[in-house]
């Protein structure tokens, strides 16, 4: 772990090191991803079959790429009561939150008396990527597909990698089915993103791509942006805990360890505190709790490379550091956590008080856990239902309203040398020629 104390002579330099930007950009990965994308574009299903064999160890035919209704039914039959209850609880909260967040049509009159407004319609066909990796991200299926369902997207396409035997995790399959996936394909990685964007013989193209993934998935989304829209480019998980001397160090340590166990080894965790005693107590708690966790080997890698316990001079310095780091998750365990919220401008999600660990947001609270990472929170927000909606403006002018607008149109058309623009408006107020 990296430990930074106020008394350190190089304190400010260490803070700069802690705030160094994280990026999934890798020129080697990007070049490999370009090759995969081009192969899928050129060879379609044949390329998907080849890459599934190479990267996932599964031998499939093109006909086996789609998940069948029988498989979906079997996953539902296999789902036990605890899984059913957890999925239903999470989906209910996600849907409730998303319904409040969904954008709605509006209409009003402008200064000319014309009717102007916006209409919000769902994307007709969306693609959702659900990662595989060292742990099945069942919750990610809910945190993406549910939003598409609430938005009203009629076609929700899901791609997720299969195991060596060609099967999908039954819990993940159950969650995707429950949330509202209309099509599910056993294909992963950048080849899945390419298939959803360019289409193959089996997978028809989508209009927008959603979901997190590894460096290859992120590279594919970056390279294919412009062919379609994408949501975010989220990387490995991040959590920052701001704790004063009132925080329970057991809670702080548990939350840091929880976010370090995802498995990529690139997760980043920070504890920021004004208290030297708190820093020492959290360090001790991490050492005590680590041996009790099943994924301690994954966690240890993150502790060795990307874990920071940082003491700052005061809460003002803490807030400044948080805004520099722009963490994916920001927990505030201070005496008055709500007072700090208006001052935090770049966190993906904020969790207030000692009873609000990040894992609640990961699984059941309601907001989507697909959030910006690597400092992107300064420019991007987390996934919301309105990203599954497309906006269209609507304008309706009557003749009286057009008459009021004509002078302004003529002025701009003259300034820009576009007389056809001016004519397009003016002709509507001219008398109709006789004989027509």
Region locations from a protein language model:
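Conserved small-residue-rich beta-alpha loop and adjacent elements
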Residues: 108-174
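A glycine- and small/hydrophobic-rich beta-loop-beta segment
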Residues: 262, 271-347
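Short internal beta-strands
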Residues: 154-164, 269-275, 282
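Conserved NAD(P)+-binding/catalytic subdomain of aldehyde/semialdehyde dehydrogenases
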Residues: 180-258, 262-268
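N-terminal Rossmann-like NAD(P)+-binding subdomain of aldehyde/semialdehyde dehydrogenases
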Residues: 1-124
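Short acidic-hydrophobic, aromatic-tinged amphipathic segments that line or gate anion-handling sites
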Residues: 3-9, 183-188, 309-314
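C-terminal core of ALDH-fold dehydrogenases
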Residues: 315, 323-436
